Amino acid sequence: EPNLEPEYGRTSIVPAAMELPGADLYISLAAHPGRPEVLTNWMDPSVVSEDDPLSVDPTLDPFDEEREIPFTKEFVDTYRQAQRRRNDRITQWARTEIDRVVAAGHHDRLFTTPRLWADLRMIDGSIDPNNREFPSCYLGEPQRANYGIYGVGTVSSLRTWLSMWSLSDSQCNAAPHLARIKIPALVIEADGDSGVFPSDTRAIVDALGSTDLTTHTLEGDHYLRDREGARDDAADLITNWVKDRY
């Protein structure tokens, strides 16, 4: 049955969302455990001001020339906590800003979120190890990408942020929903992924409520582009798995 809550500022759910048909099978391919989690894990918590993409708290800067790699456990723990605090700060601002915009007779507005390519796992290959190249991210060299203008979540509306990226408000976190999935499930990871890591895949596997659960690791990067035949292998794997059940 539906498991949704009205978004911020609304009292009801969009009716069409309640009419979506249930699935027969669950398949995830190089999937992360939800948009709020992946964006938070990627974001740079050393940003001091959201209005200044060059502002840096040096105690949290993963690209500081004096920062030793591999990172210390203390730094990793502090960094992860700071990432979640940054997400929460943006969420609190977005709620307040929605109230201000609505009070002025409008519905929404756009804003930018800088520096979203700074997952420590993109820099330090000893954290959550797999066969990925490092330092690397989906846009190449992490520091260059982090200070660039391209990236998932870089431009949002206030309502998009709360609906899609906010740790506290978004319903796009996978964990609360995965336990409700009892149908047969196939979880595939790419062993050279530089943005979705082994612990992300384990989180999905551990959260699923399916008893018929198959996991598989493919050789290749996130988009299965680097190795010839990788996408064919994925298609064959999925096809055979589905045929075994229908």
PLM region spans:
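Acidic beta-to-alpha connecting loop that harbors the catalytic carboxylate
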Residues: D191-D193, E219-H222
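C-terminal alpha-helix
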Residues: L237-R245
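Active-site nucleophile elbow and catalytic-triad environment of alpha/beta-hydrolase enzymes
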Residues: T11-V14, R159-H177
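Alpha/beta-hydrolase-fold enzymes
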Residues: T11-C137
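Catalytic histidine-centered segment of alpha/beta-hydrolase-like enzymes
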Residues: G220-D232
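Short alpha-helix in the alpha/beta-hydrolase fold that links the catalytic acid
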Residues: T40-D44, I183, F197-D206
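Short beta-strand/loop motif that positions the catalytic acidic residue
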Residues: I181, V187-E189
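Conserved alpha/beta-hydrolase "acid-adjacent" motif
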Residues: P36-V38, S170, S194-D200
